[in-house]
């Protein structure tokens, strides 16, 4: 199966990527590497997957990426992308949370 995993570099997303690859699926992962967690930690999450020829990583924002190109050939889409840390969502980072948690999900569902 051809799978797309959003939030592929996060803890949950990268674990799912590894599981799908272990089952023999082709996986395209997308992540925008927001700075909530250190980039190095997210890159380590994907270290094993990057060694697999059936894995492709796209570093882009789901709000601006060509969603048709990303999703049209996928048989399964696993949406794991989200801005973590709920407390900060009610402060100065509200826009980031609404964009990355609500608008991105809406865009995927409308496709």
Put a short name on every predicted segment.
Residues 1-111:
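N-terminal Rossmann-like NAD(P)+-binding domain of SDR-like oxidoreductases, especially those catalyzing
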């Amino acid at each position: 199966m051809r799978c797309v995993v959003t939030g592929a570099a996060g803890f949950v997303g990268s674990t799912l990527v590894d599981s799908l690859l272990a089952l023999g699926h082709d996986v395209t992962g997308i992540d925008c590497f927001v700075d909530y967690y250190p980039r190095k930690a997210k890159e380590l999450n994907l270290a094993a997957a990057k060694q697999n020829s059936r894995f492709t990583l796209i570093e882009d924002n789901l709000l601006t990426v060509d969603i048709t190109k990303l999703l049209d050939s996928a048989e399964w889409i696993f949406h794991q992308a989200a801005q973590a840390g709920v407390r900060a969502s009610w402060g100065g980072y509200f826009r980031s949370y609404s964009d990355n948690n609500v608008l991105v999900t809406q865009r995927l569902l409308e496709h």
